[in-house]
Every structure is written in structure tokens, then in C-alpha cells.
Amino acid sequence: MKLFLLLLWLPASMALTACDLSDRLSRQGEVIHDRLNHLEWQACSLGSQWQEGKGCVGTPALLTLLEAKDEAARLGEGWRLPTIEELFTLLDENCRMPMTDPRFFSDIHDNGENSAPYWTSSSIEEMPELVYYIDFMHGLIDGHTDRFAQAARLVRSHP
């Protein structure tokens, strides 16, 4: 019986430990440091607020691209929308719905359409009227017009 329970527990525990970005990410309050890519991420999506001891509180705001860029400019201090390459670094194929480590990015939620799209600052070269986004529920990359409302997470370079 003990062996049976161990065999049931083992795959579940392996699945829980497989989604782990702590080898390159660390948290300092509301900022996530990415040592590998020399970036700093806001722990909370725009619209959510960081509360010490609770993490991200609230729901990510759904913003047009211009609204997200305006919010980054308002915050200053080098915060900006990430490029497609930068945002892609937060995906981990070992993580499931969302496809990133929830210990670092806890406020990624289904927007009601079985997706969690996040803006990038990168236009699609072949169709410049479309801007890349990443769906963090499924790890899909696609493009949309800048007037579509999606979540946004800001980044800044870190020397």
C-alpha cells in the first residue's frame, strides 16, 4: 500500500517541481530579476498592485497597445513593453496554464476566453499593422491590431 501511494505521489510531485524558473529568476519585492537575460520585470501585470505578504492583488487591466505604452511612460524609470524575444523568455514548456512559473508571475489568469494574451512592442515584419502578443495560457504567439485590449507586463534593462 505504501509503495502504491508513493507511486501515485511521485509523478504529481515531479510535475510540481518541473515548472521552475528560479535558476535564473529572483524576486526583490515587486521586481523580478532575470540574471540570464539582464532584465528586470514587474512582478504584477499592469492593473494589478503589489502588496507585501500577499503578492499581486487585483486583476490585470486589458489595455490597447497605446494605453500600455502610455502607462509605461507614466511610470518612467526605464519601464517599457517587452520585445517578443524578451517576453518569450518567460515561457517554460514545463509549466502549464499559465506557461510560466506562478511563483514569480502569480497574476496571469484566463481572461474568460481560455487565454491570457500579453502585449509586446514588436510589430510583425510582414504585416506591420499587427503587433505580436503571447498567450500565457497556451504559449501561443500571434499578432493583433494595436486597438485590441490585452494584458501587459513591463520590463526594463538591468546592467
List each language-model region with its residue ranges.
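Short acidic, Pro/Gly- and aromatic-enriched capping/linker segments at domain boundaries
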Residues: 17-33
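An exposed tryptophan-centered "aromatic clamp" motif
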Residues: 66-78, 84-138, 142-144
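Positively charged n-region of N-terminal signal peptides that target proteins for export
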Residues: 1-5
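Short aromatic-cysteine micro-motif
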Residues: 30, 35-80, 84-87, 91
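Hydrophobic h-region of N-terminal signal peptides that target proteins for export
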Residues: 8-17
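Bulky hydrophobic/aromatic "packing anchor" residues in well-ordered structure
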Residues: 38-41, 119, 154
